[in-house]
Curated annotation (Swiss-Prot):
<keyword id="KW-0436">Ligase</keyword>
<dbReference type="Pfam" id="PF03129">
    <property type="entry name" value="HGTP_anticodon"/>
</dbReference>
<dbReference type="GO" id="GO:0006427">
    <property type="term" value="P:histidyl-tRNA aminoacylation"/>
</dbReference>
<keyword id="KW-0963">Cytoplasm</keyword>
<keyword id="KW-0030">Aminoacyl-tRNA synthetase</keyword>
<dbReference type="InterPro" id="IPR015807">
    <property type="entry name" value="His-tRNA-ligase"/>
</dbReference>
<dbReference type="GO" id="GO:0004821">
    <property type="term" value="F:histidine-tRNA ligase activity"/>
</dbReference>
<dbReference type="InterPro" id="IPR004154">
    <property type="entry name" value="Anticodon-bd"/>
</dbReference>
<dbReference type="InterPro" id="IPR045864">
    <property type="entry name" value="aa-tRNA-synth_II/BPL/LPL"/>
</dbReference>
<dbReference type="InterPro" id="IPR004516">
    <property type="entry name" value="HisRS/HisZ"/>
</dbReference>
<comment type="subunit">
    <text>Homodimer.</text>
</comment>
<dbReference type="InterPro" id="IPR036621">
    <property type="entry name" value="Anticodon-bd_dom_sf"/>
</dbReference>
<dbReference type="InterPro" id="IPR033656">
    <property type="entry name" value="HisRS_anticodon"/>
</dbReference>
<protein>
    <recommendedName>
        <fullName>Histidine--tRNA ligase</fullName>
        <ecNumber>6.1.1.21</ecNumber>
    </recommendedName>
</protein>
<dbReference type="GO" id="GO:0005737">
    <property type="term" value="C:cytoplasm"/>
</dbReference>
<comment type="similarity">
    <text>Belongs to the class-II aminoacyl-tRNA synthetase family.</text>
</comment>
<dbReference type="Pfam" id="PF13393">
    <property type="entry name" value="tRNA-synt_His"/>
</dbReference>
Length: 426
């Protein structure tokens, strides 16, 4: 026997038993962004490597360690996209969507990062994101946070997530703070871990996000960015908080929240959960007003967020909120003998036409009644339709209930659609 080929480490299959939960999550995401009037954008999986170096930042973990980069046959450096925002900006600039325009966009698709696979974190993962361009005021920051809160409500996990909020100010304010932070870190350099020492000069704000407990103890005395903000940044953040208070969205201000990508300014936020252990962040985002110009467009304010679907699915499974997923099959149609096969197939087609939301599976492959009923039960269907010679002669169909103790019934073929609709099989 030939050796089986396995999936690449950290790149997982989503199997038929898992797909219904994924479909539920995706349906909630689509309906939620639709309710806010957002439009879908789809971008290529492969982009020029420079796109991510210029947007994410050359001294970030993603660019330094995690990107899947390769040279094509022309010698061009290409990269599997590690996140969705840079591609969305590139597409907007290239296709004239952003200049002097407002755009509310969303995307969903696979991303790739070569990091150590662990629960809820994979090398290929599915990301959903929202991006808004052309609006620089705090009300749109509030809107994307309201939208994110709506997702949790519709998924039934509002009580299991909490919002952390911060502001990074504008680039000039952050530059002054950066110098102050470096000066502070230099006083404690010998006590820092190696990762923080490496970042101290190249990307000092990322030291604030260190997971090392000793570093966090040192940072308790560090200067806070909030003290370096100008009036405009303070007003923006104050207006955002007022709007969130007005609509009842609770939050905690986290002065250590800086996000892992270089392009953020002013508002940054994360929705976190305590139900997934160390992988606590389930959605993150913020404002990135300089990114469009950084990638060749005009100065354009922008704000958005992204979430990994694997973590949302894992959270739903952890909280055991995946139990009410409907079966992929509502009705299983059987033929009691070869002479009944054609009519059984026709009945299945009639039901699909009359009741478009009904999920109808036809038995194929023959077999006796016992075999067909075993397949019907395994399919997860609520009822099986038995079509034999007696039923055909009388214009009837036998309905066998598979999930409760109701006795099987004979129903006129002409009334079958109405009967199944009355059973509330949807």
């Amino acid at each position: 026997m030939a050796k089986q080929i396995q999936a690449i480490r950290g790149m997982n299959d989503i199997l038929p038993t898992q797909s219904p939960l994924w479909q539920k999550v995706e349906a909630v995401l689509r309906s939620s962004v639709s309710a806010y009037g957002y439009s879908e954008i789809r971008t290529p999986i492969v982009e020029n490597t420079d796109l991510f170096k210029r947007s994410i930042g050359e001294v970030t973990d993603i660019v330094e360690k995690e990107m899947y980069t390769f040279a094509d046959n022309n010698g061009d450096s290409l990269t599997l996209r590690p996140e969705g925002t840079a591609s969305t900006v590139r597409a907007g600039n290239e296709n004239g969507l952003l200049y002097n325009q407002e755009q509310r966009l969303w995307y969903m698709g696979p991303m790739f990062r070569h990091e150590r696979p662990q629960k809820g974190r994979y090398r290929q993962f599915n990301q959903f994101g929202v991006e808004v361009y052309g609006i620089g005021t705090a009300d749109i920051d509030a809107e994307v946070l309201m939208l994110s809160a709506r997702l949790w409500e519709k998924l039934g996990i509002s009580d299991h997530v909490s919002l952390e909020l911060n502001t990074l100010g504008d680039p000039a304010e952050r530059a002054v703070y950066r110098d102050a932070l470096i000066a502070f870190l230099e006083q404690h350099k010998d006590a820092l871990d190696e990762d923080s020492k490496r970042r101290m000069y190249s990307n000092p704000l990322r030291v604030l996000d260190s997971k090392d407990q000793n570093v966090q103890a040192i940072l308790a005395g560090a200067p806070e960015l909030m003290d370096f903000l100008g009036e405009e940044s303070k007003t923006h953040f104050s207006q955002l908080r007022e709007l969130l208070d007005a609509v009842g969205i609770k939050y905690t201000i986290n002065p250590r929240l800086v996000r892992g990508l270089d392009y953020y300014n002013r508002t940054v936020f994360e929705w976190v959960t305590s139900s997934l252990g160390s992988q606590g962040t389930v959605l993150a985002g913020g404002r990135y007003d300089g990114l469009v110009a950084q990638l060749g467009g005009k100065d354009t304010p922008a704000v958005g967020f992204a979430m990994g679907l694997e973590r949302i699915v894992l959270l739903l499974e952890t909280l055991e909120l995946n139990k009410d997923i409907p079966s992929e099959v509502d009705v299983y149609v059987t033929a009691m003998g070869d002479s009944c096969l054609v009519e059984a197939i026709k009945i299945a087609q009639e039901l699909r036409s009359a009741l478009p939301n009904l999920k109808v599976m036809s038995h194929c492959g023959g077999g006796n009644v016992k075999k067909q009923m075993k397949r019907a039960d395994k399919s997860g269907a609520s009822v099986a339709l038995l079509i034999g010679e007696d039923e055909l002669a009388e214009g009837m169909v036998t309905v066998k209930h598979l999930r409760n103790d109701i006795e099987q019934q004979r129903v006129a073929r002409s009334a079958l659609g109405a009967f199944l609709a009355e059973l509330a099989i949807k």
